[in-house]
Structures are given as C-alpha cells and as structure tokens.
Amino acid sequence: MEYRLELEHLKEGCPVMVTKLPKEILEEIVSWVKYGREIKDHPLFMLRKHENYGKNSYQLSVPSRMVEESFWLALTLRMTATLCGGHHRDYKIRKWDGHFDSYDVWLNFSYKGDHNPEHKHAGSLSGVVYCENPDLHSIYFPEYDVEFSGEPGTMITFPSHVLHEVKEQLTDNERVTIAFNIIRKDDAN
C-alpha cells in the first residue's frame, strides 16, 4: 500500500497547511506521549524541562532516537520538500548536539491558565501535532485572522516566520501537542 500525503490550506491565501496523520504514525506519537508522561511524573522532571517563550505546564524534547527511528520524521521531511521545494535530503530537524533538548521536537502538556503569547520560530518550517485536545483549544494566526482547533491525529505546518499564539486555556482538561522546527541543511541553527 502506498501512502499519499494529503495537504489542505487552512484558508485561501494562508500558508498554514493541515494533514491527517496515518494510524501507523499516530502509534509512534502515542509512544512519545507515554514517554513524556513518564518523565513528567519522575521526581527529577525539572531537570529535563524544555524552556521556551510560552507558558505550558510542562514541556520536554522527544528523545532523538525516537525521532530518528520514526516514520513521522520521514513523512515530515518529505512534506517539507513538497511545501518548500527541493529534495527531502535538503532538510533536517533543528538540533542541539550534546544537549538534553537534542532535537527541536518537543511535547507540550498544557492545563488551565497555560498559554503561548504571539511568537514565531527559527527555521524554515514549523508545525504542531495534536495528540490530545479534548476542548479543541485553538492556535491563532493573527496575520491571516484564522485559527485552528486541532483534533487528535492532525498536524499543521507553517513557515517558521509566521506569527501565531495560543490563548489562555480555560479548563483543567489536559491538552497535549508536539511542536517542531525544520531547517534547510545549509542553514545554521
């Protein structure tokens, strides 16, 4: 069976793309979330915390071995080449060699009061995989006046320079997403 990548624009004229991930990749994602929960519940969890611009209750990088062995990585790099031009070998996940954050692929565990103010990312293409989103909490792209309430199993991608934000979460229900940044191989981190 051959997999056919189906991408849709979130809105006409908007560079945000949406795709539904195949079940085989969703199984990988479930294992990443399970791993993240184990670290989040560990007594030394704060040592592995991924810090960035936003406010999520807990963030941590997906281990490089899980990313490297995944079909998700192959799909995402092939999709990047389709969207940005060139060959999939022209792209890679942004990486921090020798650091516990390793790749720019991280889990976000969000609860009531969490939010991400308007920001952009480094790299060529960024994205979000929706793992759990019981209240369909949305990401907002102000330049295009469009929001997306990701259902589990969907992934969005957008040029890294596109401003976006996640408004304050108003419920106690856990929201779990995975964010990532992709760069051209010849670009610096």
Task: Place the predicted regions along the sequence by residue.
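Catalytic core of non-heme Fe(II) oxygenases with the double-stranded beta-helix
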Residues: 89-177, 181-188
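Non-heme Fe(II)/2-oxoglutarate
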Residues: 1-97, 115
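Intrinsic structural disorder
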Residues: 1, 188-189
